[in-house]
Amino acid sequence: MKHFLSLLAFVIITFATQGTSHMLINVDHYEALGFLRPEPIFLLGFIAILIQGTIMTGCLHLLAPEGATIRLGLIVSLGFGLFLSSYISFASPAKYDVPSIWEWVAVELSVSAIQFIFFGLALGFIHSLFKAKTKSELKQAL
């Protein structure tokens, strides 16, 4: 159940942050790129979100199988967030002719920071709700 709830939280938080950035706040920023599809294929992005969320909740469980803390949730989320956002923030403007490299970096890093901070809080909180009381309870939960 904790993995399902964590994955659901990641989907909601990702759509809230990235969707708001792409479709409301930074529309001109993304339209200026000139290579985006007129109609994005949301299924492919959704698959990526599911894979990323599954990996993060699984890693937190491996790190703290008897129950995590909000602090550990933040560490896992921010670690993966830094890993994932480093490509989009730095490698993408190196390859693509973005109008302003520093604007690109600022937008991508700030939105990613918001996304992964909120998810880290949610991830740690959700996992903390499922703390095993004894080793036998832990074995039953697995």
Where are the regions that the model predicts?
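Juxtamembrane/disordered regions of integral membrane proteins
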Residues: M1-L142
